[in-house]
Amino acid sequence: MPKKSKDGSGKIKRNYPDAFIENAGIVVQEKITDTLEKNYMPYAMSVIVSRALPEIDGFKPSHRKLLYTMYKQGLLTGKRTKSANVVGETMKLNPHGDDAIYETMVRLSRGNETLLHPYVDSKGNFGKSYSRDMAYAASRYTEVKLDPICNELFRDIDKDTVDFVPNYDNSTTEPTLFPTTFPTILVNANMGIAVSMASSVCPFNLAEVCETCIAYIKNPDHDIISTLKGPDFPGGGFMLYDEEEIKEIFRTGRGSIKLRSKYNYDKSANCIEITQIPYSTTIEAIIEKIIDLIKQGKIKEISYIRDETDLNGLKIAIDLKRGVDPEKLMNKLFKLTPLQDNYSCNFNILIGGVPRVMGIREILGEWVAFREECVKRRVYFDLNKNKPSSS
């Protein structure tokens, strides 16, 4: 920044009087398409490829860097370590800061209940995915190790099954993909927002996914819906099953699924207890919406609502006024509040660095091809290792 002179002249003294500014005062005319191509597209593709969208192994780069760091730390078989230790080591692969790394760890943990099959075995307060107010503790207070399911993520990774690339400062290497032995891309929910596109892959039952994959390998024309009935969300609740909608999602990778909360009616207390809510919402969003409806006069049957969630699990208690039919009230709440919510599916996955929206059959086809390549590379590695050396 230019400094003011101290000689009292009031003139601004330049730090670099001989500096030359290229095109100073000149307006450069350029087609907007060319400008976008040079400036916007590299940024957009960087977000799409390097951050937001999952790949065929079911992971984004941030997930992969964290889990691989934990694997290298021996946390697949060893005892838990402080989360802060893992975060610090992960920064060798991920330079985006400790807060971003720890937040990724929280979402992958068992304690947060975001995933159907968590990858991180956690100890301590990791918050809850269904509550905005239940914040997770700092990394120095929590402990983690890899969940046993991660054995299937790293199996034979040391046998040249996948490619490795240098990290950001060329001090070490990291895998471009994990040689997963089951279609993780379909087992756990994966959401991401990129530039001009997004991804939202719903989770499915692990046993059904494996059964469907085996059937597909034996017969590529296998009827997918006969073995994979529909999504399976963590946290419970009900899915309003629409077979035609499910078939459309399976075929195109796009669609919407209706999820409904589970509740009990305590007759003695004249109280409705919500014990499970849709995966796509939170306790606070539900309570705020109900209170808003009460203020507007659209809901008059409720005398009090409170959050009774504790270590035993989720619970929203709704006290009813005398003479209110709980079933009729719940039907009204399902229509007006997130107690019934939609989960939008958009199976947008990176294949060879290119985003593609695919149906279940296409995803299975891509995963099987990927897995076949991993097996071939492992076999070649073993053959070369056991090959007798020529004397």
Predicted regions and their residues:
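C-terminal interaction appendages of subunits in large macromolecular complexes
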Residues: 2-16, 23-31, 191-193, 197-391
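Catalytic phosphate-handling regions of large nucleic-acid enzymes and associated NTPases
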Residues: 2-253, 315-317
